[in-house]
Amino acid sequence: MSKLVPPHGGDKLKPLALEGNSLMAELEKAKLLLKVSCSSREVGDIIMMGIGGFTPLEGFMDNVNWQSVCDNMTMSSGLFWPIPITLSTNSEDIKQGDEVALVNGETDDIIATMVVSEKYSIDKSHECNTVYRTTEMAHPGVVMVMAQGKYNLAGSIKVLSDGNFPEKYGSLYMTPMETRAYFDDKGWKTIAAFQTRNPMHRSHEYLAKIAVEICDGVMIHSVLGGLKDGDIPADVRSEAISVLIKNYFVDNTILQSGYPLDMRYAGPREALLHALFRQNYGCSHLIVGRDHAGVNDYYGPFDAHNIFNVIANDALVTKALKFDWTFWCHKCGGISSMRTCPHNSEDRVLLSGTEVRKILSENKELPETFSRPEVAKVLQVYYASIKDEDKIEIKLNDHFTK
C-alpha cells in the first residue's frame, strides 16, 4: 500500500482521459461536433484534468464555483481550490445541453469533448482583482483573463489527447500516476516539489539540497506549458537542470519531470495551486522561496509564504517548505540565507532567475556566484543562437534594485 499523501479531495486520482476503444469512438464523434477553440492556458488545463493533475475536478467550473473560488478559494462543495479553472468562447450559437469538441487554438487538433452545463458571463475585473490583485494590463495573467471570450462554458469533459507533450519531452513529461509509481518504487514517503520556470541557479541548488536533507527525495518540476516573452524555453531549461543534477546531486535523490500548464503569474494564489496539484503528483511538500510565481513588483517577496498561513489547516495535505532570502555571501564563501548569514549587504550577491536572464541576454558572462559552469555553458549556447534584434529586454524588479 502506498505511503504517499492522498490526492486532493479524496483517496484516488481522477484522470479524465479516455483510452482504447472509448477514445477512438469519442474522437470519431468529436469530428461532427461544434468546435470551441481553446487558448494555450485552457489546453494546459484540459491536459492537466486528463492526467489527473487537477483531481478531483471533472471539468470546467460553473458560475457559482467561479464566484466562490474567486472570493473564498473554495468551491461550492467546500473543496479548497485557489484559482478558477474556466473555458471561454465568443460563440453566440452554443447553448446549455450542447455537446462540443474542444480544439487546440494553435493546431486545431481535437483534445476533448464537453457537455455544456452552463453558459455564463463573468466580471473579468473581479477575477483579476481577486486572483492577481491587479487589473493592470502590464500583468501577463491579467492579459490572459481580459483576452478571454464573452462567455464561460461549464461542463464535464472527456480528454482525448495529451497534445504534443509526450512526443516533445519524452520521459521528462510524467503524469501523477507515473510520479507516484516512481516514488513508491524508490520507497519514498516524503517528497518536496521544486517548482521552476527558470534554469536552476546556485540559490535554487541550495534550496533543493536542504530539501533532500529533510525529505526522502526532491522532484524538480518544470513548467512545460506557455511562458511570458523573455523566459527560457523548456527544452533549454531542462538541459541546464539535467547537467546540474548529474554533476552536483547524489544519485537517486532527485526526479526531474515536467507538467503541461501555462504559468499564470498569480503569485500567492498560484503557489497554493502549485501545492494542490503537487499533492496529486504525490509530493508531501512544496518548496516556496522568494516571490514564488510572481512577476515584476505585483507581490511582496514573501506573500506566497504568508498565504499558506491564512488557509484552513485541512485545505491541503501538501505543506509549504518556506525559505528566506538566499544569496551568495563573499565572507561565508558560499550560498547563505538571512537565517544563517551574519554579514552585511555589501558582502552579499542576491540571485534571481530574472537577473540570470538579464546577464545572458546582454551577452555577459555568468559569474560562478550565480551559476555552475556546466549550467552557464548550456545557457550561453542558447543565448548565442538568438539574434540581438530578437532578444527581449529584461528588467529587474524592485526586490533587487532597492
Swiss-Prot record:
Transmembrane segments: none annotated. Keywords: ATP-binding, Nucleotide-binding, Nucleotidyltransferase, Transferase. Pathway: Sulfur metabolism; hydrogen sulfide biosynthesis; sulfite from sulfate: step 1/3. The keyword Transferase applies. GO terms for molecular function: ATP binding; sulfate adenylyltransferase (ATP) activity. The keyword Nucleotide-binding applies. SUPFAM superfamilies: Nucleotidylyl transferase, PUA domain-like. InterPro entries: ATP-Sase_PUA-like_dom (IPR025980), PUA-like_sf (IPR015947), Rossmann-like_a/b/a_fold (IPR014729), SO4_adenylyltransferase_pro (IPR020792), Sulfurylase_cat_dom (IPR024951), Sulphate_adenylyltransferase (IPR002650). Coiled coil: none annotated. Its EC number is 2.7.7.4. GO terms for biological process: hydrogen sulfide biosynthetic process; sulfate assimilation. It catalyses: sulfate + ATP + H(+) = adenosine 5'-phosphosulfate + diphosphate. Belongs to the sulfate adenylyltransferase family. NCBIfam families: PRK04149.1, sopT. This is Sulfate adenylyltransferase. It comes from Vesicomyosocius okutanii subsp. Calyptogena okutanii (strain HA).
